[in-house]
């Protein structure tokens, strides 16, 4: 989960090479890549250089050529046959090299000494040119992935595999699906180049290990079952899921065994009977560690404190470190499958709340939410806030998750459990000792009770099923309603001088706030998610924090996630990568287009998690709840045409609409009904659900033939066909397309690599990649592109198929 940069470590070959020609070495220098799980070996650039020379020597001997020696350069990469380069470069070679190739063509064919000499000179020039590219600042992770995929030279692949260690972790993580897909479906040389980096990162990060294990399983599922069982991807996945890649010599923080002030957390005072996974690590603050069935290491109730400490230390390393998290995810998926069997939304919602209440009995634990970007432990799921989302056949659901941020997930102790009826103290943080928690104790609360996941069955679904449904009651007492710091109290404490504010300013601001306060949605039994999604995120965080027993802690955070069962999110992940790349391109080219890529976690070929877009509801929900047109809703939410709030929201709408129109055109996104288009509180639109892209469409009906969805309601919000904002929209479309085609290779390679060995419907047909490239219109002038944009906008506005598809969705699913 960290963002540190791993520098490549020097590696000594297993045997010292001789001083003779590379071809005379006893063994392949590429064997320095270790296949085992012992100490990780990294390919040194010097070794990669010699490996390249070895490959060259073998090919030269087959063609009757002469080996090229290293002329003092740190690394010389060469082509395979001396004539046609097998290394695909991003740009054409310099003109001088091209001229030399033309001049020496006949000489090389005749095999004369002069031709051979020129060939060696040409190879040296090519090597020097490629080396300069690899060592330049322009050589980024995108180029590295491109060379790794396209090159047929084992030496080049080995060098790129070593260079992965030089890039930032987050840059490589973006291409993790591509790296693992190449590892699964491409030849052994590519896999050998990638594996050292993957193994090294798995040792460093438990979250990276989980991501790799999940993706390896999902992308191996397209293989035949007999092949899949013995594939490299399956073997690497088993290695990651075992405990062999656990970081060496790393110990977790031990729970404090010294006497501490009464925190209300000792086992004798708990009102809830923990499962046996909790008993594994339960510690009485007034006695020694007690023997339990799931802790065989403890042999005597009267052991000394030192032996108790040793036993706990040993128990930390006993379970497989990914097991609790995998069981946590499995529990969430099992809930979704059970919900899908219920007929009505109301029944699904009630069952969801009950299931999550049971799940809370297992928390806190050494589990985390993989969609988050920081280290944390999950401590509680506010079950009454969960909602079932709209779906005709399945039951995706949205949950909110309370976590405590920590410096290091592996080494920080799991937070102590605080019973539901011990909600935070009132008025201010200074009053917390009234609830039994001092300031010092609060800072060290992570070490009060050890982690509860030391049992292999810490997150077994069967164990959850044995628990009784126990909906906690929230008592209103002096500890219930923490801290409503009034403005008066803050002012009196912090401000030494009076602050004078003009009464007119106060009246004006209050009137604007009243006029532009976002409206709340009414509760709809058929769509319970509308109310939850409409509530402002900050208000939701404040409300949940006030009702949480962990809310007083300074490192408390609230996260949210959508759990989906029965849906293949691999296409969603591909779309996320393309959107993220386009977003980066437009930022780099300073084109003010706005899109919102949301994180995707692929769990298997038919399940996953999605990061929700906060402060956003679907256009379908907007129209159903408000019974207004889109323009009238904007006026209701943001004020009249001339207010700053409306103009800002209108600009946001235009910039996001232009961005997503280009995304929909380039990726051929289908199923664009109003349930799959969100509108946020600032006026942006956000497209969701990229299940139909490129070569696939819903039920292959072929309804949506326009380049993108642009309705008359969208144009009305922009100010009409003659408005300045509509012209601004078309200008942004043109600028965005020009910027995107400058970086076409970065976008195309994301899709092209994932097509390797894939059975996803978006890759059906042999022309998927060719058609994608054609949509960038590389041969068109800017004037021709402008005409193309005008035609696409006009065609999309007048598209009868868009209206037909919206009508079809209304009749079949009730989507407005």
From Swiss-Prot:
Consequence the record notes for mutating residue 55 to A: Loss of interaction with ACBD3
Phosphoserine modified-residue sites: 258, 266, 275, 277, 284, 294, 428, 511
Keywords from the named record: Acetylation, ATP-binding, Cytoplasm, Deafness, Disease variant, Endoplasmic reticulum, Golgi apparatus, Host-virus interaction, Kinase, Lipid metabolism, Membrane, Mitochondrion, Mitochondrion outer membrane, Non-syndromic deafness, Nucleotide-binding, Phosphoprotein, Transferase
Recorded GO MF terms: 1-phosphatidylinositol 4-kinase activity; 14-3-3 protein binding; ATP binding
Outcome recorded upon mutating residue 754 to R: In DFNA87; uncertain significance; unable to rescue defective inner ear phenotype and sound stimuli response in zebrafish morphants
Record-annotated PIK helical domain positions: 29-242
Membrane topology: Peripheral membrane protein
Reaction(s) this enzyme catalyzes, per UniProt: a 1,2-diacyl-sn-glycero-3-phospho-(1D-myo-inositol) + ATP = a 1,2-diacyl-sn-glycero-3-phospho-(1D-myo-inositol 4-phosphate) + ADP + H(+)
Disorder association: Deafness, autosomal dominant, 87: A form of non-syndromic, sensorineural hearing loss. Sensorineural hearing loss results from damage to the neural receptors of the inner ear, the nerve pathways to the brain, or the area of the brain that receives sound information. DFNA87 is characterized by prelingual, profound sensorineural hearing loss with inner ear anomalies, including cochlear maldevelopment, absence of the osseous spiral lamina, and/or an enlarged vestibular aqueduct.
Task of the protein: Phosphorylates phosphatidylinositol (PI) in the first committed step in the production of the second messenger inositol-1,4,5,-trisphosphate (PIP). May regulate Golgi disintegration/reorganization during mitosis, possibly via its phosphorylation. Involved in Golgi-to-plasma membrane trafficking. May play an important role in the inner ear development. (Microbial infection) Plays an essential role in Aichi virus RNA replication. Recruited by ACBD3 at the viral replication sites.
Protein's recorded name: Phosphatidylinositol 4-kinase beta
Lineage summary: Eukaryota, Metazoa, Chordata, Craniata, Vertebrata
Gene: PI4KB
